[in-house]
């Protein structure tokens, strides 16, 4: 089975000042049985209050943290330390919109964060990245690795580079679009057909062919109660080396 399916059940808390990014993260994680979003907020005060009042047994396994808007390197360091004080066993995944401040990655590494990811790189792979933190000391995306190669930090130097999303060469752009709309975004077929300017019959054909391609390139067995749509989501978002 794919890494951790049936084994992992990670409690996740999301903080991102961008409400649209927050909703996207929640949506992608909701599709993956290995991750369970317990709380999300764009408000840092609500974030602290949640950690403060939550029972120790119910504290998150993972916090996904918008590291761009915390007051630079000093603000990030203070935030990471406070999270660790409130929830010592929680892994922290830092995400940034840009790499204009590579020193943020250094701070994340020094303070024990489990990942430092560029949002535009990780995209649909966020659940896979979170689950990979269980197996690796630290994870970065490839652009983060390039931007920090001259920073002297053992954890950054040895960090696991998140693989690219699995490629499906057989999948045409139109089939890929249909899969994205109906599987990733969860859009009903008739609305997706209207969005693409095609008939309902045609989009159903695209989805059927997309499912066939996804299954042909995947060798895992899945829990019997997983729907075809769940399997398709897992396969479409899988990492290149997860076969």
Residue ranges of each PLM-predicted region?
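N-terminal regulatory/sensing modules of transcriptional regulators
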Residues: 1-150
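Glycine-rich, flexible loop segments associated with nucleotide phosphate handling
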Residues: 58-62, 76-79, 174, 195, ...
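Terminal C-lobe "cap" of eukaryotic-type protein kinase domains
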Residues: 151-156
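Helix-turn-helix DNA-binding segment
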Residues: 158-204, 208
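Basic, Lys/Arg-enriched C-terminal extension of HTH/homeodomain DNA-binding domains
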Residues: 208-243
């Amino acid at each position: 089975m794919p890494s951790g399916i049936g084994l992992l059940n990670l409690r996740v808390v999301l903080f991102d000042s961008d409400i649209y990014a927050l909703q996207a993260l929640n949506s992608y994680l909701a599709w993956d049985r290995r991750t369970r979003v317990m709380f999300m907020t764009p408000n840092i005060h609500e974030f602290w209050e949640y950690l403060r009042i939550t029972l120790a047994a119910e504290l998150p396994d993972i916090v996904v943290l918008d590291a761009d808007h915390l007051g630079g390197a000093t603000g990030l360091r203070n935030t990471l330390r406070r999270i660790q004080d409130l929830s010592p066993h929680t892994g922290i995944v830092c995400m940034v919109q840009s790499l204009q401040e590579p020193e943020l990655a250094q701070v994340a590494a020094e303070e024990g964060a489990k990942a430092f990811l560029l949002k535009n790189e990780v995209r649909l792979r966020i659940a896979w990245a979170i689950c990979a933190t269980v197996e690796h000391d630290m994870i970065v995306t490839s652009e983060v690795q390039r931007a920090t190669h001259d920073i002297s930090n053992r954890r950054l130097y040895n960090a696991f580079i998140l693989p690219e999303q699995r490629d499906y060469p057989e999948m045409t752009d139109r089939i890929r679009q249909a899969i994205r709309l109906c599987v990733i975004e969860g859009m009903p077929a008739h609305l997706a057909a209207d969005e693409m300017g095609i008939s309902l019959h045609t989009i159903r054909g695209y989805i059927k062919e997309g499912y066939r391609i996804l299954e042909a390139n995947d060798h895992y067995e899945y829990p019997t109660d997983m729907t075809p749509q769940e399997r398709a989501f897992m396969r479409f978002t899988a990492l290149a080396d997860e076969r």
